[in-house]
Amino acid sequence: FNLRLTQESVWSLIVLYKMENNFKNKIINGDSLEELKKIPSETFDLVFADPPYNLQLKNSLTRPDRSKVSAVNDKWDQFENFKKYDEFTIEWLTECKRILKKDGAIWVIGSYHNIFRVGTAIQNLGFWILNDVIWNKNNPMPNFRGTRFTNAHETLIWASKSEKSKYTFNYQSLKCLNDDLQMRSNWNLPICNGAERLKKNGIKVHSTQKPESLLHRVLLASSNKNDLILDPFLGSGTTATVAKKLGRNYYGIEKEKNYFKAAEERLKKTKPIEDDFLDTLKNNRSKPRIPFGSLVELGIIKPGTSIFDQKKKIVAKIMADGSIKHDQAEGSIHKVAATILGSESCNGWTYWHCTVNGVSVPIDNLRQRLISKN
């Protein structure tokens, strides 16, 4: 019985591996609503969706010099009414939720024309909204008619599959990206232009091509190397391109033939970053929290042991309850170190040292050994 069960388990893993490989590093030319239904449940780690915005443009836009503005007036962005758009939104979001892994997440980007309707659908379908992020465009298109504020931003909604999902968030990497400051939810990034903008005979290939810098931040924040990323509205292929560069696997669906071909050519020219340079900083929160007192309880460090600063000028004794005592103060390893330094706070794990096999080491070394054993 055990052997049969093992064989069945192995066979299931093989089937799962083959199914997942069917969607690795591929893009297809097809209707998203039809293609999503063909994908097995719980296939993807992350979804990035840039759906039609339903801009409702009834007239062409012109500049003050009467030249025509290259705006979004494509058929794929046109819907009969809000009801039809809502039905479309619910249909593709439902499929995306089904094919996300239980700890997966989704990003959806939009403008004021559609993002509030999309956000309602996201909540109604049981996703759990984590953040809304404002993409402030450094170089937005002006409001040529002067009838409204210049529309200088787009909104991204980031949501996990459910409230209980253990989604990926590379906090330390994003903090490092932002000069050691917490990454905020307003991102100042330029729109796509220059050499990055795909053109054919001098004309933009795609009217709403997203900048690679935006997807770089999204994928770095919420996915890991070798994760499988889905873009159900691939467009000119920015998501797949950045995923390939960052060592993520991608699967894209694009209905428009000319966009699909442009994305295909773009991916052929894209070179991945060397694997050695793709490691991300580990989150401190992912490490188990071990109080200093636990080292005392477990006998790793004994009451009465002397601990000292790096220069061995400050000495304190360890008490049975995990507190420490010094001439100037007593309390936790952090509190006593802060008092001695005259500061509001101090990381006692790195301030205090002890002697191990005749060598002075930070007491954090003892904690790290305990963590590695567990």
Protein language model features and the residues they cover:
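Intrinsic-disorder/low-complexity peptide segments enriched for small residues
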Residues: 1-3, 11-17, 21, 55, ...
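Acidic/polar loop patches that form or flank catalytic/metal-binding clefts of enzymes
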Residues: 167-169, 275, 347
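Core catalytic lobe of class I
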Residues: 7-253, 258-260
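Residue-level detector of short coil/turn "hinge" positions at structural boundaries
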Residues: 129, 250, 274, 344-345
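Short alpha-helix boundary/capping motifs
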Residues: 124, 150, 246, 270-272, ...
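Catalytic-site neighborhood detector that most strongly recognizes the C-terminal catalytic loop/helix
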Residues: 254, 266-269
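Intrinsically disordered, charged low-complexity linkers and terminal tails
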Residues: 3, 245, 257, 262, ...
